């Protein structure tokens, strides 16, 4: 069959790579993709992921059987709806169901209604109310802007000055807009991907841990993710089971009960508190860079899993008996302003690297985004995989990239 992957980043590179391995898949297309994907997919960088009509025309022309949507924006913009209305199979939720990521308030309200464990919250609609609220709120406080923010719409404020600054950042010159304040939760964060079709929820039996902050020791601003690893040895199968029972199954049922037909992967960003696992966020798609490490470890056929889910079967994932560590190299300045167009070399285009922000300029690759390339390390345990990942990092040549030096350290410290 012919499969079209929507998106241009490292997550989509990993999806295309994994789908290309399937015996069920004849041809992988990518829109817009990136030029690093050309060994595994027919890449169409001339088509934008926001040009729904062009994507539909392409899918018709190429007899596409399945469309796999990687990023959140096309989902929230309703690309899945348009494709389904024209008879295409789509892995990714419709516009209504994608609100679970598109609106933090939507997610909070549904969790509150169905008693799904999460932090207490307060919503405000005006800047002046936000400034009033923080005068007496408990610190630290988590400040979230409603809507999409590419993983950067969350600020943890330890002081009242930091909270005021967060509000200024969230509102800018606007006086109105929804901001959600949350009680700060302490504990170990982890990411659980769950395949969902209506009230059928099939969680991965392998979790990943992301590293959101820009710099070592979890310092600096939030990013889209500076690295990830799997499995997470210090989070037990019992925690996974509990997360499934208290979060994954209830949210699938809640969404269906509220009239939202979710089909795709639901990313559960959770935290293991002293009172058990609680939800930090939901995403309506694979995490990035979690997808890259999880799909590298997945032994079974991703396309088969998607078909099983579509048929309402409780699909069984199989995993390689190894650890995977992914280290993200990003443009200096990210997640704030950064330069583009700098040469990057030293990497190969096989399973050792997944590309997020590079484009071809003549025969060389140059930077085109904030997060640039993820180096993948593999090993019998986290320590060996981490060593391998940083060996892969050392092979990349560029004066304009930075990376964290402590990806997966937590797993080694908590052994």
UniProtKB/Swiss-Prot annotation:
Residue numbers binding ATP: 134-191
Domain of life of the native organism? Bacteria
Q: Does the keyword Metal-binding apply?
A: yes
Which sites bind Mg(2+)? Answer: 281, 283
Where does the signal sequence lie? Answer: none
What one GO molecular function would you report for this record? ATP binding
The pathway it acts in is: Purine metabolism; IMP biosynthesis via de novo pathway; N(1)-(5-phospho-D-ribosyl)glycinamide from 5-phospho-alpha-D-ribose 1-diphosphate: step 2/2
- Could you say which EC number(s) this protein's record lists? 6.3.4.13
Location of the ATP-grasp domain: 108-311
Q: Pfam families in the record, alphabetically?
A: GARS_A, GARS_C, GARS_N
Obligatory cofactor(s): Mg(2+); Mn(2+)
Question: Which reaction is this enzyme known to catalyze?
Answer: 5-phospho-beta-D-ribosylamine + glycine + ATP = N(1)-(5-phospho-beta-D-ribosyl)glycinamide + ADP + phosphate + H(+)
Q: Which GO terms describe its biological process?
A: 'de novo' IMP biosynthetic process; purine nucleobase biosynthetic process
Q: Which InterPro entries match?
A: ATP-grasp, ATP_grasp_subdomain_1, PreATP-grasp_dom_sf, PRibGlycinamid_synth_ATP-grasp, PRibGlycinamide_synth, PRibGlycinamide_synth_C-dom, PRibGlycinamide_synth_C_sf, PRibGlycinamide_synth_CS
Per UniProt, the enzyme's principal EC class comes to: ligase
SMART domains membership: GARS_A, GARS_C
Keyword list (alphabetical) reads: ATP-binding, Ligase, Magnesium, Manganese, Metal-binding, Nucleotide-binding, Purine biosynthesis
Free-text remark on how the cofactor is bound: Binds 1 Mg(2+) or Mn(2+) ion per subunit.
* Family from the record: Belongs to the GARS family.
Give the matching NCBIfam families: purD
Report what the protein is called: Phosphoribosylamine--glycine ligase
Q: Which organism is it from?
A: Staphylococcus aureus (strain MSSA476)
Taxonomy, top ranks, is: Bacteria, Bacillati, Bacillota, Bacilli, Bacillales
Gene for this chain? purD
